[in-house]
From Swiss-Prot:
It comes from Mesorhizobium japonicum (strain LMG 29417 / CECT 9101 / MAFF 303099) (Mesorhizobium loti (strain MAFF 303099)). It comes from the Bacteria. GO terms for biological process: cytoplasmic translation. SMART domains: Ribosomal_L2, Ribosomal_L2_C. GO terms for molecular function: rRNA binding; structural constituent of ribosome; transferase activity. This is Large ribosomal subunit protein uL2. InterPro entries: NA-bd_OB-fold, Rib_uL2_dom2, Ribosomal_uL2, Ribosomal_uL2_bac/org-type, Ribosomal_uL2_C, Ribosomal_uL2_CS, Ribosomal_uL2_dom3, Ribosomal_uL2_RNA-bd_dom. Keywords: Ribonucleoprotein, Ribosomal protein, RNA-binding, rRNA-binding. One of the primary rRNA binding proteins. Required for association of the 30S and 50S subunits to form the 70S ribosome, for tRNA binding and peptide bond formation. It has been suggested to have peptidyltransferase activity; this is somewhat controversial. Makes several contacts with the 16S rRNA in the 70S ribosome. The gene is rplB. Residues 199-277 are annotated as: Disordered.
């Protein structure tokens, strides 16, 4: 879908760039595939803020998405493509031949009326799902499982994808968007194609209010605070903070490596931090 720009009839529409969603379904989601969604406002069960700058925003209902795609060899028809406020990608309503309804993440080039199917060995076309062991090398995939049966966890946001670049001893080698190369078990499911809404990264909200509608509150810099609130606070007039950037709790930030070693590190063949050759 294309981007929409506006005539500058107000200051906020001057910079405003949004995704044209005229081709999406305009009604409400399927009630049986939705759940209530309670806002946390960034608070935990003690009522204390654990994630700053979160709160407000438009009320949402959660759409239950099928990330597992384990309904094998039952053909489904795409009823419509819908907007989902809980994610950057669009979602597709699928009606299977046995009458069951389901939501999946909509890949690019999937339209109402298309047929999709999941199985051990199915056609390589957008929306079809199969184990990585069954796919030809070079296939573009999304919604990739890291553990068989757990459901897709990788490449689920707008425009995301990975490429199957090889196989080795029952494992599939994937190249992710970040440049990381990773091995995943060949029995893990993945869906063919790249995720819909690739223009999401070109959106410009145009005004602070549109960000607030999404549930994000104003993000204050440490240098504008008082010393009691942040290590960068205080000083006469505007200051640069006077030290290397730290979090409100004094931990180094902006580039400091914080990732701890994990048992799954052995599945990373090439780090996303290695220089691109």
């Amino acid at each position: 879908m294309a981007l929409k720009k506006f005539n500058p009839v107000t200051p906020s529409t001057r910079q405003l760039v949004i995704v044209d969603r005229s081709g999406l379904y305009k009604g409400k989601p399927v009630k049986g595939l939705t759940e209530g969604l309670t806002k946390s406002g960034g608070r935990n069960n003690y009522g204390r803020i654990t994630a700053r700058f979160i709160g407000g925003g438009h009320k949402r209902s959660y759409r239950i998405i099928d990330f597992k795609r384990r309904k094998f060899d039952v053909v489904g028809t795409v009823e419509r493509i819908e907007y989902d406020p809980n994610r950057t990608a669009f979602i597709a309503l699928i009606k299977y031949d046995d009458g069951e309804l389901s939501y999946i993440i909509a890949p690019q080039r999937l339209a109402a009326g298309d047929k999709i199917v999941a199985g051990e060995a199915v056609d390589v076309k957008p929306g079809n799902a199969m184990p990585l062991a069954s796919m030809p090398v070079g296939t573009i995939v999304h919604n990739i499982e890291l553990k068989p049966g757990k459901g897709g966890q990788v490449a689920r946001s707008a425009g995301g994808y990975a490429q199957l670049v090889g196989r080795d001893q029952g494992m599939a080698i994937l190249r992710l968007n970040s440049g990381e190369q990773r091995v995943v078990h060949g029995s893990c499911m993945a869906t063919v194609g790249a995720v819909s809404n690739p223009d999401h990264g070109n959106i410009n909200d145009g005004k602070a209010g549109r960000t607030v509608w999404r549930g994000k509150r104003p993000h204050n810099r440490g240098v504008t605070m008082n010393p009691v609130d942040h290590p960068h606070g205080g000083g006469e007039g505007r200051t640069s903070g006077g030290r290397h950037p730290v979090s409100p709790w004094g931990k180094p930030t902006k580039g400091k490596k914080t990732r701890s070693n994990k048992a799954t590190d052995k599945f990373i063949l090439r780090s996303r931090h290695q220089r691109k050759s």
